[in-house]
Amino acid sequence: MAALMATNALAIDSMLPALPEIGEALGIAVVSDRQWIFTAYLLGFGASQIVYGTLADRFGRRTVLLAGLFVYAAASVMATFAGTFQAMMIARVLQGIGAGGTRVLTVSIVRDCYSGRQMARVMSLAMIVFLTAPILAPSIGQLIVLFADWRWIFAFLALFGIVALVVVAWRLPETLHEENRVPIAVGPIAHAFAESLTNRLAVGYMLAMTFIIGGLFGFINTAQQLFVDVFKAEATFTVIFAAIAAFMGLASFLNSRIVGRLGMRRVSHAALIGFIVITTAHAAIAFSMTERLWIFAVMQAATMFCFGLVASNFGAMAMDPLGHVAGTASSVQGFVSTVGGALIGFFIGQHFDGTSVPNTLGFAVCGLIALAMVLVAERGRLFRPHQQPV
């Protein structure tokens, strides 16, 4: 499960060190337009999830997952040979469409087998492995461009997709039995979509996750510009980025150890408050124009630690009341959080002004809005130990 989830992180973060080379080769004149390499992928990734759940509920998890991995691998090959910016955008959208299945199906497979705190614990363990991908991906990209053309990054992604396809075909059993499959019919699908979009807890945590992810995507969109152009840290960019990302993995590991005892709400609500305090302080430092590289790295690492505690639990809480329509619910939530997060992140990225202010302020605002969504979901009460009727 974790390796499948890593296909997404690899397709994003391995690009970071090669952005200048990709931009030059494809004739991208405006530096900020390079962000479309990420955004095009994320839009395909998010939009495709709206159909994956319905297909998975009808045909089973395994078949649909195999189809998605095939599209991912084929699109990676297309990107390897793209000769224009437009061709790259098409390949990246298709790559995202293929990878969308890995997000929906992994969550649905876990939900088929677990629920509640046990689901959160399993997701946290998967996130530990998953989060090693953004730690290693920039270094993989950097290593490739040191010895070969940037196109070999996409060749690596194609190989990863093929290996994942073979492993799933060989080792993964079907988790949705025939008697539990839902036919493709307008009535049941509309009912499942309506339930996914009207459950207070599910919608509240889905929207909260959307804004938290939006802040993260804003950071990823501008990471290369921040470290290289603002802090002049080109030589140490991948190392610092990996260290920051490692704090997400550390948080997910910690979450897997404490969530069973403390509960999802206590852990994630405390982490969200910490997220807001840290990002607000970071924004104040950025506004003072006295920020140094080490300050940025420390504050960003603390932010990512809180993000790691929030992410696994918010996703699990959004899915928990919708187990009987897990495939469709996972699709709806994946579509909203990814497409919404991508657009928020693109908005933050396009406001890059040569300082860290847009990035840090974007994180703080997204955190505050996420808190508002949680308060709506929980009817104004935080840290509740058990789920109440909604």
Regions of interest found by a model, annotated:
Residues 175-205:
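Juxtamembrane intracellular "pre-TM" segments in multi-pass secondary transporters
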Residues 87, 116, 121-172, 176, ...:
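Helix-loop-helix hairpin linking two adjacent transmembrane segments in secondary transporters
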Residues 266-314:
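C-terminal transmembrane helical hairpin of 12-TM major facilitator-type secondary transporters
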Residues 71-78, 86-94, 294-300:
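Paired small-residue
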Residues 28, 60, 81-87, 98, ...:
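Helix-breaking motifs and short loop linkers at transmembrane-helix boundaries and internal kinks
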Residues 91-132:
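Cytoplasmic helix-loop-helix junction between adjacent transmembrane helices
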Residues 46-86:
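Conserved MFS/SLC helix-loop-helix module at the cytosolic interface between two early adjacent transmembrane helices
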Residues 18-47:
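Extracellular/periplasmic helix-loop-helix junction of adjacent transmembrane segments
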